[in-house]
């Protein structure tokens, strides 16, 4: 593993913008506090209110100045922005959406990426925006080996592995030759083999298309407060020690779950996976003090 770079794909380029900015600055200022060869491979998410978005519904609107500022924040640091264009209910009429196409045009610089799961949008993006790297989304719920091998043989930059396959030795061995094309979710909080996961994705897609902020979904997992320690109890969890084992087998792309989670969940995930054990307290203090300073500054600005 010593010579291999490990790429981490982080959540919430818009929603967790401040946290991600603090993290990037700390990685630059205190590189010895972070695990060697660990890099930010991308930051995924959506701008507010984009109907192409899937996975987690996000409402509102992001103005053009903020769109440009956020793209610049990451791209100037060499970090790709990855759009979660995974709405599973998209039809051809939706691909011409003015707002989503505006976002794509602003981000079309050869660096940024798109997660996809609908052929109608994927084909449109390949035609209209060939400069974007396309990633096959875990929202497709490909849980069979044959389907996964077929997906890996398609023209995708990466394929995100379904979390239920994280420790499936038959699958991991079979895809070993294409390990560098696989992205693995390390801290999924969803129950193993969740029978409602695909239905939940569809419900979130419908919420996004209809701007239905009040729609509810009967998920027993949503009744609990989300804490990072909870994901450690899941069979799909991959520990920081196991990351090295996966990397030795050629798997070098890892995704940290966090969309729709509290900031503390995401912050603890970053501290656990990216920071060296003996530096965690120091980086935690730096991170929290900086976030508090920003929060105080925002309060004064609003007063």
Regions from the PLM with identified roles:
Residues 2-147, 156-303:
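Active-site pocket-lining/capping segments in soluble small-molecule metabolic enzymes
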């Amino acid at each position: 593993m010593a010579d291999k770079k490990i790429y981490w794909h982080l959540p919430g380029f818009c929603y967790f913008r401040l946290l991600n900015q603090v993290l990037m600055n700390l990685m630059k200022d205190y590189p010895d506090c972070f695990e060697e060869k660990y890099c930010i491979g991308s930051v995924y998410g959506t701008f507010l209110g984009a109907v192409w978005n899937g996975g987690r519904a996000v409402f509102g609107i992001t103005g053009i100045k903020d769109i440009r500022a956020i793209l610049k924040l990451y791209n100037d640091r060499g970090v790709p922005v990855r759009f979660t264009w995974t709405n599973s209910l998209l039809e051809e009429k939706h691909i011409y959406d003015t707002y989503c196409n505006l976002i794509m045009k602003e981000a079309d610089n050869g660096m940024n990426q798109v997660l996809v799961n609908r052929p109608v949008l994927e084909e449109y993006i390949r035609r209209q925006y060939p400069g974007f790297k396309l990633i096959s989304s875990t929202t497709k719920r490909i849980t069979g080996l044959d389907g996964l091998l077929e997906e890996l043989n398609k023209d995708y930059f990466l394929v995100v592995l379904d979390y239920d396959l994280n420790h499936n030795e038959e699958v991991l061995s079979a895809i070993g030759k294409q390990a560098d094309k696989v992205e693995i979710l390390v801290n999924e909080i969803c129950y193993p083999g969740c029978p409602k996961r695909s239905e939940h994705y569809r419900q979130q897609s419908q919420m996004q298309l209809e701007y239905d902020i009040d729609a509810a979904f009967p998920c027993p997992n949503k009744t609990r407060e989300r804490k990072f320690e909870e994901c450690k109890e899941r069979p799909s969890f991959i520990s920081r020690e196991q990351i090295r084992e996966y990397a030795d087998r050629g798997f070098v792309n890892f995704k940290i779950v966090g969309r729709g989670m509290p900031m503390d969940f995401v912050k603890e995930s970053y501290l656990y996976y990216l920071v060296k054990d003996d530096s965690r307290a120091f980086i935690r203090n730096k991170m929290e003090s900086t976030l508090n300073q920003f929060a105080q500054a925002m309060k004064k600005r609003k007063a």
